[in-house]
């Protein structure tokens, strides 16, 4: 779900566009990974974007607020982030969260939150929380925190 600009798709942002910013950094004590979706001011967002953003945010909050016992796997938690989208017949094609390393890779396992995440989560494991929704050719939304 990472956009790659090409000569054919390269253009200036316009009022009413949604701009998805995926950023992070590596520091002595760890790695960061954050994504935000912002509206370029001047026009209303694309049709359906407010509802989709709200559903993504609800899923993000549900996962962030979850309290669960040691041994719960990522597949069990994945449903919390997807449920608001599923209620509207929507979904996203990527995992909800990935392990995060320090000095190695921002995407590091074995822990992950996804439809296939079978590794039991344990204290000390860092996993991202990044549900999204992508309306092909229209807009994309993702909210990510660690």
Q: Each PLM stretch: what is its role?
A:
Residues 1-146:
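Active-site neighborhoods and metal-handling regions in enzymes and metal-associated proteins
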């Amino acid at each position: 779900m990472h956009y790659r600009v090409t000569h054919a798709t390269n253009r200036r942002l316009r009022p009413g566009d949604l701009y998805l910013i995926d950023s992070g950094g590596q520091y002595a004590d760890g790695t960061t990974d954050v994504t935000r979706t912002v509206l370029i001011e001047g026009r209303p967002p694309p049709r359906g974007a407010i509802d989709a953003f709200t559903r993504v945010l609800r899923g993000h909050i549900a996962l962030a607020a979850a309290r669960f016992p040691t041994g719960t796997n990522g597949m069990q938690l994945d449903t919390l982030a997807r449920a608001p989208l599923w209620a509207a017949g929507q979904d996203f094609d990527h995992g909800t969260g990935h392990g995060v390393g320090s000095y190695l890779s921002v995407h590091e396992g074995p822990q992950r939150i996804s439809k296939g995440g079978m590794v039991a989560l344990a204290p000390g494991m860092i996993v991202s929380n990044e549900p999204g929704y992508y309306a092909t050719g229209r807009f994309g939304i993702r909210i990510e925190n660690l």
